[in-house]
Each structure stands twice: as C-alpha cells, then as structure tokens.
C-alpha cells in the first residue's frame, strides 16, 4: 500500500476539518542571492537548498550542499526549521521537510506552519500529505518559458 493511500485510508470515515493551505501555512518564495557578490557565498554557514539536495540526500533534510552567508539573507529572515519546501516551478511537486533554519532557491515555495496551528498538526503528517499536494501541483501548472504552479489554486488547496 502506498503512503498516500494509507493516509487517505486513515481519514476514511473520520470527520475532519479541511482548511486552505494559506490558512495553515505562511507561504514564502525562495530566491538565489547574487552569484556576483562573493561575500554572499564565501564562508557561508546558512543552508541554501536546491533540487540537487533532494535528489542527492532525500526528502528529510538537515543540511544542504551549498551554504550562504548571513549578508545574503534578504531582510534577515530565514525560513524556519520544520518547514516544507515544495517545487512550484520547473520540477513541479518535489518536496522535502527541512529540519533547520534555511533558505532555498526560487524554484521552491516554503510552507511554514503558522504558530496558531502548531498544536493542531504534526509536521510529518503534513509532509506526507504534501504527496497529495504534489500530485495536485503537477495537474495544475501553467506553461510559459517553463512550467509553474497555479498559485491562486495552490493557496486554496485543502489540508485535513
């Protein structure tokens, strides 16, 4: 039995409240600090995730292949630990649970559980439920120079 059908089976016959993704999570897009500014990349200690991290090290990650320095962080705000990165452009739907404060490139949208829901959800359940979100993302893409997810629909995706 696949992980997804097991999760769906667990909810069979159970009353649950379904909430839109944007109500449960703070959503932020990733970005790539300028490669021309050497100080952004020299002696960095902040994990900066790319698709290669998932491909090479799996879906639950506590370290990245590349690091950036604190001066590369826009507004001084990192994505929080125990948040989920999901690819919303190019390689649609790939996702990972990140267990440390971090940043990621622009292909990812970060899903950070809102504090008001911290006691309501288990982040690992949400991570596994993101396999359903990933499937939805692959079916709801727009094409321009590269594939990207319908972000209006993405924000409305329902979470049990």
Model regions: which residues?
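Non-catalytic DNA-recognition/assembly elements of restriction-modification systems
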Residues: 4-31, 57
């Amino acid at each position: 039995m696949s992980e997804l059908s097991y999760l769906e089976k667990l909810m069979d016959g159970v009353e649950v409240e379904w909430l839109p993704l944007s109500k449960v999570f703070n959503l932020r897009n990733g970005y790539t600090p300028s490669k021309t500014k050497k100080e952004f990349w020299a002696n960095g200690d902040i994990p900066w995730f790319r698709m290669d991290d998932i491909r090479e090290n799996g879906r639950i990650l506590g370290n990245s292949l590349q690091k950036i320095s604190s001066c590369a962080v826009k507004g001084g705000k990192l994505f929080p630990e125990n948040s989920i990165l999901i690819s919303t452009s190019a390689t649609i739907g790939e996702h990972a649970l990140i267990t440390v404060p971090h940043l990621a490139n622009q292909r990812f949208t970060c899903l950070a559980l809102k504090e008001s829901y911290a006691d309501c959800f288990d982040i690992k359940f949400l991570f596994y439920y993101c396999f359903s979100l990933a499937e939805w993302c692959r079916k709801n893409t727009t094409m321009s120079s590269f594939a990207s997810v319908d972000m209006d629909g993405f924000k409305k995706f329902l979470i049990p």
